[in-house]
Amino acid sequence: KYTGGTMGISAVPGSGKTHTLSALAAKLVEQMMTNKTSNPFNGTEREVLIVTFSNSAVSNFSARIAKFLSEKGLVPGIGYRVRTLHGMATDIVRGRAEGYGLDPDFNILDETAANMLLRRAVEQWAADDNAATFNRYIKKDIKEEKQKGILSGKWLDDITTVAGSVISQAKDYQLSPEMIADRLKSFPGEDFSLLRMVSSIYSRYQTMLRSYPALDFADLMFYAAQILENDPVYLNILQDRWPFILEDEAQDSSLIQEKVLRLLTKRNGNWVRVGDPNQAINETFTTA
């Protein structure tokens, strides 16, 4: 009986959430068509936006919604859009890429390609700053055997892992390399030495991404949030385009992903979140 508003639904695996969300999407499309709210508004065609995590889920939702619409006598493929969260962010960023110094034809690196590029940034850092520099970042009480392993070559893998985790967190909190470097100026000497190291690697990594040009998955959400916060006209257009947002696997949404969806739904307030709180990896998902 949902017709609008914010709603959280707890759904354990096997409870039929895909079927239910697909049926709801079809109902909302029919509702918009009946009310003629799907007609162009300010040059924007209105759609129900369904966001999920995997491409396979996108295909599944698309097929089910199309089936429900056909049964209602409506044309499939009109009045809704099914995207992964990163696919949605890509749509947002491409629409305003040039205003943020990005090539509108940027490539998107998957996790494997991004990790390979990050490893190159680490190797560049090591070549520029000398491997011995890392010695300063190792705790004095570290076991001698581990220290030898780190400095004999394995340390590049360790640094890449640490840098990847920190960079991902930085982007989740919308912190650029420049912002981190600027904040570190308040802490002279050896304070936050590990963060200084990662900041240098982060800067090199972003420079490499721009040279392609390319964005990684975290960049997509980083820029999507920035654009929506700083461009109210564009945000208004997107809010007109997507008056309803249905979110699948909400328990897996990161802080910045939740922020982007909150910005998109702030005006209309029509946001349905479906997830399993028992599998939540953060605190952004709460049940109704």
What is each of the regions a protein language model found here?
Residues 1-21, 49, 81, 110-114, ...:
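Conserved helicase NTPase motor core
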Residues 1-104, 108, 236:
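P-loop NTPase Walker
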